[in-house]
Amino acid sequence: MSPPSDDAGPGPPRTLSLAARLSFAVGHFLNDLCAGMWFTYLLLFLHSVRGYSSRGAGLLLLLGQVADGLCTPLVGYEADRASCVRCGPRKAWHLAGTVCVLLSFPFIFSPCLGCGEATPEWAALLYYGPFIVVFQFGWAATQIAHLSLIPELVTSDHEKVELTALRYAFTVVANITVYGAAWLLLHLQGSAHGEQDISVGDQLGVQDVPVFRNLALLVVGVGAIFSLLFHLGTKEGHRSQHWGNEPNEHTPLVAPAAQPLLLWKHWLREPAFYQVGMLYMTTRLIVNLSQTYIAMYLTYSLSLPKKFIATIPLVMYLSGFFSSFLMKPVNRRIGRNMTYFTGLLVILAFAAWVALADNLGVAVYGAAVLLGAGCATILVTSLAMTADLIGPHTHSGAFVYGAMSFSDKVANGLAVMAVQSLHPCPSELCCGACISFYHWVMTAVTGGVGVAAALALCSLLIWPIRIRNRDPRDRP
């Protein structure tokens, strides 16, 4: 495969072989494995297993999200400016981020080294802080480098959707791996101790520390293998330092007017940048907050057995996995906006179901299918819309993805901290009031944020995505 050119200007369309598409799609697998644990199990591990306060657990998650949010636009800006002779700037940042994730993530889900029963909570939380910051820097570097490769590798809108859908399909596979491994480790733990099937609230405790530690080690081991496959199979083109490319048989006889570079400061003047940013942020809030609180909802509101913190998220992501394969034909038939709206309707149906049913029982599996399919649909479509926004301006694409992710990470962290601060049982793991608390949290993070996402979508229906023409002389 020849290296892709830098822009989507005149010339042959850039396409990828199946092997190249698959090798690209697995480049975010380590991040997805870690994110599955981070969002689904971090609060549960810190609050229910380690016994830290709900506010302390929320503070650590907020620290991670803010660190990620601050690093993301900086990495995006540097990735647009950087150069690397051997592998290209995006892959160089991807490699640096991967190393940071591998070295830091296992410590987050392990006991505090040197801490004892007399260690104050603030000291233990302080211990986890540096590992979380390093992990989030690495996660941000890997995410932005990987996302910003999409508009550089292919030019066709449908191929961008296909790459994004393949990427999300492996995101689902990663989460299936995490939840399947979690179920297996919990099952093996129960078999080893000959425990009876009792309520999850009674089972989760300090005895589960080895389960989460082993799960984290498994995550980084498997993720490292897939990161290696990405670097071996994905070729990033080296950027030319000159305007334009050498003429070939696809070059028009009369050259079009030169299109000025769209720099990071120019994006800040584009209304479409804020419209897509709001849609992306609300989409990520729905996906991440529902993933963060589903385990708490199952544990404390529905009082389901321990295995459900693995099986229900597994059902969600299996549903999302199968839905991701419908993205390309559905987008082609009804367009981006209607595809997103369809996914949003499914999520609102889930929110209504949760709000109206005090005890779902076996129906929780059906609700999980709805949530998984809806989240997959809106996430893939919002990423495709972001690629549409960037269009041929791939030289500043990493900044766009960085800015989008900054808003989503900080918003997620603040939302989690707000929820944790409102927790009605500050002095114990769960009192009677927290049963309804997590019930309404799940309703709000899907239905309430879903309404905000619908408003953002309406703005794109009224004012479609477009970049205003600028004077070519308007350069720094």
From Swiss-Prot:
Post-translational modification: Phosphorylation at Thr-251 by MTOR via mTORC1 pathway promotes cysteine transport in lysosomes, thereby regulating lysosomal cysteine and cystine storage and redox homeostasis.
Catalysed reactions, as listed in the record: L-cysteine(in) = L-cysteine(out)
Residues found modified as Phosphothreonine: 251
Annotated protein name in UniProt: Major facilitator superfamily domain-containing protein 12
Principal subcellular localization: membrane
InterPro entries: MFS_2, MFS_trans_sf
Molecular function, one GO term: symporter activity
Pfam families per record: MFS_2
Disruption outcome: Mice are darker and display a uniformly gray coat color, rather than the expected agouti coat color. Coat color change is caused by a lack of pheomelanin, resulting in white, rather than yellow, banding of hairs.
Its job: Transporter that mediates the import of cysteine into melanosomes, thereby regulating skin/hair pigmentation. In melanosomes, cysteine import is required both for normal levels of cystine, the oxidized dimer of cysteine, and provide cysteine for the production of the cysteinyldopas used in pheomelanin synthesis, thereby regulating skin/hair pigmentation. Also catalyzes import of cysteine into lysosomes in non-pigmented cells, regulating lysosomal cystine and cysteine storage, which is essnetial for redox homeostasis.
Side of membrane Lumenal, spans: 47-55, 116-121, 189-213, 306, 420-444
Membrane topology: Multi-pass membrane protein
Family indicated by similarity: Belongs to the major facilitator superfamily.
